Amino acid sequence: MNASGKAVIAFSVVGQDFFPSAGFASLDAVNGAGAIVISAPGALPDYGFTGYVPFGFRSARWGDYSRAVADESGAIWLGNEFIPNGPRDILANWGTFITMVNP
C-alpha cells in the first residue's frame, strides 16, 4: 500500500488457459479489487523438479516468491514467479518478473 491508500496484490495465475504467469490486481477502499492483470504470461508448464523432499517431490514448490513494496513516489513494485521461455537449469524452469504499477 502506498501513502495514498492504494494497494496492489501480487500473485501467480495458473489454470487451464494459463501456464504459471505473473499477475496482480489493484485494491483501494473506494473501488475494492480491480481486474486481474497478467504482467508476464507464462510460456511453459512447471517442470516440478523443485519439489519438496518430505513429499517425495510430488508437490512442486510454487508461489513463495511474490513481493510488493511501495516507493516514495507512490509507485508499487512487484516481484512474481512465472515460467518464461528462456534459459533454465537442470532443477528448475521458473523465473522472476518485476512490474511497476502506478495505482
Where are these regions (language model features)?
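C-terminal PAP-associated
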Residues: 1-103
